[in-house]
Amino acid sequence: FKQDFLLDLQSVFDNLVDITEPICQDIDGNLASMLLFDTSGIEAYVAENNPKYANRIIKQIKSYAKAHNLDDSFDPYKAAYASMPASAAANHEVKQQYVNGHFCYAYKFGIMTNGLGIVRSIDFYNKDYLDSHPDIIVEKKSKSPDEDKSLADSKALIPTLKDFKKRHPIINPEIFLGD
């Protein structure tokens, strides 16, 4: 269904955003004039998301650290993160990322809402989106999940805002908040 009607579904959503904008302005013009951006991910059902997968790697790294007398500054969790693959074996669009306080394998997306909490845009950072925005980098680049998240979020912001403005020229936010 999604493959056949993805563009139609996107068009319906975009039209609803344009139709509901005047309603949002009538409810509260100040809140409607805010635009909030965040990225998140939808965890996929892949083997890499099974806690046993990560626990096995962490256990191996802890054993290695103990056998080699590594000091207390060694972080086995960061080492496990760095040693795990950047994407799931079953689907390369399912990327390793830091979502809601933990790392997992997920489909990454950006979401924009107004100050009323009404969703104005959802952009899935899938292959097609990334091909049309080569400046967005989703692959892990460091050994720290926190650093990777901040790098990926900052790279996604500008292209997502430009696409939003192109799709919804009547919406002119006065305040922008990004996480």
Each predicted region: which residue ranges?
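Polybasic low-complexity intrinsically disordered regions
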Residues: 1-178
